[in-house]
């Protein structure tokens, strides 16, 4: 049984979402960020239940010019397999049934709350595509910044240092999305994109008032399983250390 936490919507929250006529207006997401990256990047289904195993070419074969009656040595390319993991981004929404039913605006009220969750999931996903680091947060997938973080690394030639030394530096990315270059992934056998489950009316335990008491609430579940696969580092360039205060 779920527990309705102190993060649940209150009557005051509900009142703030009504216009003078008692209807639920469209809410402008003032904190919204434009994450066109999520629509621009290409996505493929992974070949693993937890992500995607990709083969990366790490070395080219040796070739040579030859003279008549002289041969050349055979050679081969060198490859390596890399397992890219996916993360599970989730959220739960629980609204007191009677609170949602006030003034008969149940559907509109739940929709306004759903839009907030969609925006939050969208922003978090866009943030993780660039700054995810499973070394610091094991629940995340590795984003692009952790892969382009050292000028002395093999892909350091694709990192341009803008020279900023402040604490508010940012980066500009140039990415050629593609199935053979850089792309998004989702686990094998799963659905792509943001998944929403309307679990309807359920009984939840509330932490407000007397502990252990129960109430009826509308419950929604949100989930997004995704990751990033970097197959060819030559197709992404990072212009790093841009001082935004100057």
What does each model-identified segment do?
Residues 38-47:
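Short, low-complexity, charged/polar segments at coil/turn and helix-coil boundaries
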């Amino acid at each position: 049984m779920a527990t309705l936490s102190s993060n649940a919507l209150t009557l005051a929250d509900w009142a703030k979402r009504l216009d003078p006529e008692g209807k639920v207006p469209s809410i402008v997401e003032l904190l919204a960020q434009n994450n066109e990256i999520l629509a621009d990047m290409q996505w493929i289904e992974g070949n693993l239940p937890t992500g995607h195993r990709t083969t990366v070419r790490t070395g080219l074969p040796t070739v040579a010019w030859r003279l008549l009656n002289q041969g050349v040595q055979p050679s081969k390319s060198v490859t390596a397999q890399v397992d890219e993991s996916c993360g599970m981004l989730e959220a739960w929404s629980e609204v007191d049934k009677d609170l949602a039913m006030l003034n008969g605006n149940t559907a509109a009220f739940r929709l306004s709350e759903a839009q907030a969750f969609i925006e939050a999931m969208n922003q978090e996903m866009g943030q993780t595509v660039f700054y995810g680091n499973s070394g610091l947060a094991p629940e995340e997938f590795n984003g692009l910044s952790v892969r382009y973080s050292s000028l002395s690394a093999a892909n350091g030639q694709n990192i341009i240092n803008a020279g900023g030394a402040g604490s508010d530096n940012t980066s500009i990315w140039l990415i050629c999305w593609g199935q053979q270059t850089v792309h998004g992934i989702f686990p094998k056998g799963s659905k792509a994109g943001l998944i929403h489950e309307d679990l309807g009316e359920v009984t939840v335990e509330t932490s407000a008032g007397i502990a252990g008491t129960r109430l009826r609430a509308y419950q929604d579940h949100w989930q997004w399983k995704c990751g990033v696969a970097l197959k060819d580092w030559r197709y992404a360039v990072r212009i790093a250390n841009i001082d935004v205060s100057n």
